[in-house]
Amino acid sequence: MARVDNIGLAFQTYYVYIMTNKGNSVLYTGVTSELENRCTQHRTKNYPDSFTAKYNINKLVYYERFANINDAITREKQIKAGSRKKKIDLIEKENSNWLDLFEIKVGTDWL
């Protein structure tokens, strides 16, 4: 969904995100324009045969915002190409306790 800035121009926000399971043993990186909806899909196993459903990926531990979809896709690919250690370092720099950011942010003006 496009948002409107303070002078009435529509703009879109894109997100690169990392989710994990309860034990933080499996990491999933994705890109979306609707982070709250996408997290809900993962959490409710909307696609039961998907990777995220199979490995119970339901905890949002990291996300970045982008104004340009191409920048978001480039960043997603960069994160996916990195090692597990690099992903963990990225998460721990912003969210050292691996809190579920969805639980903290849902319903707020975080998007």
Q: Across the structure, where does each feature detected by a protein language model lie?
A:
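C2H2-type zinc-finger recognition helix
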Residues: 69
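Short, surface-exposed polybasic/aromatic micro-patch for ligand or macromolecular engagement
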Residues: 66
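Short arginine-rich
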Residues: 77-91
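GIY-YIG nuclease catalytic motif and its immediate N-terminal context
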Residues: 1-47, 53-63, 74-77, 94-111
